[in-house]
Amino acid sequence: MVTDNSKATDNSANPNMTQHAVLRELGHKFAGKFTEQFTFDGIPTIWVSRQDLLDVLMYLRTLPKPYVMLLDLSAMDERLRQHRDGLPASDFTVFYHLMSLERNSDIRVKVALSEDDLKVPTATKIWPNANWYEREVWDMFGIVFDGHPHLTRILLPKYWEGHPLRKEYHARATEFTPYFLNNAKQQFEQENLRFVPEEWGMKRSGRDEDFMFLNLGPNHPSAHGAFRLVLQLDGEEVIDCIPDIGYHHRGAEKMAERQTWHSYIPYTDRIDYLGGVMNELPYVMAVEQLAGITVPERAQTIRVMMSEFFRITNNLLYFGTFIQDAGGMTPVFYMFTDRQKAYDVIEAVTGYRMHPAWFRIGGTAADLPRGWQRLVREFLDWMPQRLDEYVKAAMENSVLKGRTQNVAQYDAKQALAWGVTGAGLRATGVEFDLRKARPYMGYENYDFEIPVGYNGDAYDRCMVKIEEIRQSLRIIRQCMDNMPSGPYKADHPLAVPPPKNRTLNDIETLINHFISVSWGPVMPAGEASMMVEATKGINSYYITSDRSTMSYRTRIRTPTFAHLQQMPSVINGSLVSDLIIYLASIDIVMADTDR
């Protein structure tokens, strides 16, 4: 029997919730003005009225040890949700995920909206990075944010009809009329790409001369991804820039609503397509949290080892292309050789290279193959010396230092305000890594360091990523030397089939097994989330189950969405040549940004 755990309570009914200090503080300031909700992830979650929203958000932003980062902002269409006993009445819900580094804690604030009044005040005056998140919510749900400076579509073309994450919006291509592209439609599409400065409040001329508007992109996916930067230039100086994203948007969150909990795993690989199993980890961990599955120690160690291999392959590509964008052509070819050696190990273990879809709910798809230690050891013996050579040849080169030091510089306060995580945050001196701050998958058992920089410039961001490779090598060696015995998958009915003898002798077990395999397992109703320190920063999955074989709502928070939004605040006033270095330093993959 599955029970519904997604229930709201008053402020005193749930001791597990009231133990959070922030809820006690809110109770003193806003007594009787919020309702608590239980979630499987343990993050304190409250519902507030639309009238109190900005007051609550501002209080959380300014209290001692404040919630300085708006980690995520999104919404959910609740009109078809059945298992929501005790929650405030809501057709649509907007939620704000806030993070405090000083407290090392989060809080989730929700606002209930009725279908006939989909308006909520903008939070852009509290957190500047609310801008893009609110545009995405309007794009996907049609919720209006009063006072937003430029509420337009962001992932979809401006002529798009409808809001795809509403429940009445079709989820399959076969439910739409066939798409075709004739000459008239092609001209229409191209005309809609024309940039009109006045639509963005930009002037065409200054006091003495006209400004030049330059389309940088859309680029080929191999050149940092399919996106466009519209630059307002005065000579070589960037007056303003507008990142134009969405070219790689594929509706990843909508797809989750039509896939079983298991069959959605391959789709996660295509988010950050350089991250491999690192993409799968937060998703399967969130489902395991929802289902109450404990992953065996061996499976945890295997997951850590393979995740760190993909961190290395990602950072090697980043390192090579960073040097290439700065003018050095040779190193990237050497680093592709090193990546190939890492992929040899990955392919031997998972059967695939970049998109293995190898993690499973409860563990992994298979155990480690015979001879895996030899392959891992060979790579561990090979890589450190190569890395030393690259640093000496490239990062200690005076020309590269001149191109990258004190370029695209920002401090910790700016990084936190814009939701920057990963190497971009640590390069400003903030020693925050989820593997240390909030260990998962047994990371608390590994001996490794958190690389940090202090200048917050392009050079420091690259040096942090290089040192991450060294720390990943340390972690992998510890995995190899201390690989525990035992199963590679949890013995749980939602993760593995029942024993063969039971299916042969018990008809009910056989029927349940048939339904589970053909339709997919049914997960308990409720909400769960998991975040990991991915290759580019914090990647999280926030899933809602309505006691079904499919997710009711899957929210994917990706790091590069926040990192690209910060770009104008960093690069305006700099030169175009500095912009190229900045792009190289932030490690973007547009499938990660656009989802």
Swiss-Prot record:
Top-level EC class as recorded in UniProt: translocase
Substrates-to-products reaction catalysed: a quinone + NADH + 5 H(+)(in) = a quinol + NAD(+) + 4 H(+)(out)
GO molecular function terms listed in the Swiss-Prot or TrEMBL record: NAD binding; NADH dehydrogenase (ubiquinone) activity; NADH:ubiquinone reductase (non-electrogenic) activity; quinone binding
Primary site of residence: membrane
Subunit organization: NDH-1 is composed of 13 different subunits. Subunits NuoB, CD, E, F, and G constitute the peripheral sector of the complex.
Record keywords, A-Z: Cell inner membrane, Cell membrane, Membrane, Multifunctional enzyme, NAD, Quinone, Translocase, Transport, Ubiquinone
GO cellular component: NADH dehydrogenase complex; plasma membrane
Region (NADH dehydrogenase I subunit C): 1-186
GN (gene name): nuoC
HAMAP family: NDH1_NuoC, NDH1_NuoCD_1, NDH1_NuoD
Membrane topology annotation: Peripheral membrane protein
Task of the protein: NDH-1 shuttles electrons from NADH, via FMN and iron-sulfur (Fe-S) centers, to quinones in the respiratory chain. The immediate electron acceptor for the enzyme in this species is believed to be ubiquinone. Couples the redox reaction to proton translocation (for every two electrons transferred, four hydrogen ions are translocated across the cytoplasmic membrane), and thus conserves the redox energy in a proton gradient.
Keyword NADP: no
Highest classification ranks of the organism: Bacteria, Pseudomonadati, Pseudomonadota, Gammaproteobacteria, Moraxellales
UniProt EC number: 7.1.1.-
Location of the region described as NADH dehydrogenase I subunit D in the Swiss-Prot/TrEMBL record: 210-595
Keyword Ribonucleoprotein recorded: no
Provenance organism: Psychrobacter sp. (strain PRwf-1)
Designated name of the protein: NADH-quinone oxidoreductase subunit C/D
Similarity section: In the N-terminal section; belongs to the complex I 30 kDa subunit family. In the C-terminal section; belongs to the complex I 49 kDa subunit family.
Location(s) in or outside the cell: Cell inner membrane
